[in-house]
Amino acid sequence: QPLVRHSYQEPVETYSTNIMGTVHILEASRRAKSVRAIVNVTTDKCYENKEWVWGYREDDPMGGHDPYSSSKGCSELISSAYRRSFLEAEGIGMATARAGNVIGGGDWAQDRLIPDIIKSLEQKNVLKIRNPNAIRPWQHVLEPLSGYLMLAEKLYLKESDVSGAWNFGPNDEDAKTVKWIAEKLNFANADSVKSKKY
């Protein structure tokens, strides 16, 4: 379940999907003779939110202040436990991949900045932006995806020990504010998006 606000509305569904879903996938994978590598893609929201200025490191504590984030932290812990308890002994490579603020690729889910801007343009509505000055590590979906595929290949070929957790993100200087993204999309369109903070 990939949506933060939805996790507040449906916490049981969120935990059931993200926690037990992970358990069921890993259990099925370890019993399938053909599986040789697993990459569980979670999120950069899996960390205990420290509100500090630098990026999180792979060995920082898991946490989360909301059902979505904490469920993804749990998925990470489950993956680590399965890797150590079962998968390593069975020769299955296991890694988790964490990326945040991925854009592009046809993601039209609710509460996604770029789709919300496009919808507001089409419907000529005022867009409500929660936190316009928040700085986010924006990246196009193909950027982390190429990393996930490379990680899966290395796990499969056993080229090196890449099992464990991996963060995928842009360089620090490429992180931009929500407002910056909204303004760039406004500039690209003949109509402007009127936005207000809420």
Tell me the role of every PLM-derived stretch.
Residues 25, 82, 113-120, 147-151:
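A short, amphipathic alpha-helix embedded in the catalytic core of nucleotide-handling enzymes
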